[in-house]
């Protein structure tokens, strides 16, 4: 059965990436949401997904796991998900891959939590600040170099590079991170995207029994 398996919308940053790609590509697949228990202990996901993680997409005979692989699959169906220009596309792939593989300090210190609103951490380590500075620089450089035709990193179209950074937009919002003017304008633009608003709306409908103390109590 075709489906997109995702975790708790409130917390699952990788699920958000896969979901955005699937929706942007116009794939007609239902969401199957599994409440996360944290720490890789969600047995229902292990029973379904080949790598025991979300997102996991089943579509017309294809079975795809890992967010970036799902994004690439969606781009084969909807090529607009990558910039048309060769140079811009190369840079978009580079920053998307950097986001997929890097920024570990930020991920650990500021896990995605859509229920947290502009509440900074009591302490922010130098490694986290370095990650924030690098992301700010990526956003500014791509906007200045490729963003003349629209509000996103590579212009008018919301592409995979934007999708990969979408959970970071949520993190920066939740933890009240201060950004440069260009990066701040981009953060607000992505936050206002209709699909981001829809994800937030659906997250707000999840039962409170799905909330995890390890994220809710983070200071």
Please report, for each region that a protein language model flagged, where it lies by residue.
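Acidic/histidine-enriched, glycine/proline-rich intrinsically disordered or flexible terminal extensions
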Residues: 203-219
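Short Asp/Glu-rich motifs
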Residues: 41-42, 191, 209-210
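Conserved beta-strand edge residues that scaffold enzyme active sites
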Residues: 35-38, 186, 204
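GST-like domain detector, emphasizing the conserved glutathione-binding G-site
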Residues: 1-125, 129
């Amino acid at each position: 059965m075709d489906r997109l398996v995702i975790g708790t919308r409130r917390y699952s940053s990788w699920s958000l990436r896969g979901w955005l790609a699937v929706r942007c590509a116009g794939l007609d697949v239902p969401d199957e949401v599994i409440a996360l228990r944290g720490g890789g202990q969600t047995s229902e996901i292990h029973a379904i997904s080949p790598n025991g993680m979300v997102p996991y997409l089943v579509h017309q005979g294809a079975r795809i796991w890992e967010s970036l692989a799902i994004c690439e699959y969606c781009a084969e169906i909807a090529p607009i998900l990558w910039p048309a220009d060769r140079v811009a596309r190369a840079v978009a792939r580079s920053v998307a891959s950097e986001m997929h593989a890097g920024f570990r300090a930020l991920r650990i210190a500021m896990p995605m939590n859509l229920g947290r609103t502009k509440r900074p951490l009591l302490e922010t380590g130098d490694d986290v600040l370095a990650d924030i500075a690098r992301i700010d620089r990526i956003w500014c450089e791509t906007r200045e170099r490729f963003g003349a035709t629209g509000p996103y990193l590579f212009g008018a179209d919301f592409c995979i590079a934007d999708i990969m950074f979408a959970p970071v937009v949520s993190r920066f919002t939740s933890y009240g991170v201060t950004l440069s003017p260009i990066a701040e304008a981009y953060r607000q633009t992505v936050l206002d995207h209709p699909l981001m608003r829809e994800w937030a709306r659906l997250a707000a409908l999840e039962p409170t029994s799905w909330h995890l103390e390890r994220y809710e109590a983070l200071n």
